[in-house]
Amino acid sequence: MRHAIWLVILLGFVGCAPQEITEQIPIAGHRSVAFRRIGNEFVKAENDRFAVVEAGLTTYRTEGKNFVRWQFTIRPRPDTQLAVVEVEDVTGRRPVLIIKDDHPQIEELQWSQQSPLARATPALVPWLFSPDETTRVFRITVTEPDGKQSSVYQATRYNAEAKKKFRVLMGPELQNPPAS
């Protein structure tokens, strides 16, 4: 009987653990890419040259104006030299270059960079103000000094609650966006 109780408890914990799911997401160029996620979080992408450490949105407020920008961090493998790092948003019909670093610097074994600031308004960043869940997909490409290129795709997902938290961080005027 005692073993049966422990088995039930153990199965309860296993049943509560988020399962890994593979999800196909369409990207620019009429293609789709498979992503692994656990719960609502996508697994960080990696290949034999580098691994994604961070891909996410940050907020910035100055002089009463609200901004957002993307922040990316990768960790190159020990034998990988960086000559150029490019990050493209491939969520839409065409890729959009958001970062091109022609002189990447490694600090504490990582490369990190932020995109330019974008005004956080419903007209300029409409997905942030939509109540629907949003998935953004980025292609991160590393070019090495010998011209060798390698790329990974990284997805990020924002549900309605996460978007609301971003708007709260930015300021009271963005907490209740206008109805579309």
Which functions belong to the PLM regions below?
Residues I27, F42-N47:
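Proline/serine/threonine-rich low-complexity linkers at boundaries of modular beta-sandwich domains
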Residues F50-P78:
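Contiguous beta-strand segments within globular domains
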Residues V68-F72, A83-V85, R136-I140, Q154:
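Hydrophobic residues positioned within well-ordered beta-strands of beta-sheet architectures
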Residues D102-G147:
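Short, solvent-exposed, Trp/other aromatic-anchored flexible loops in extracytoplasmic proteins
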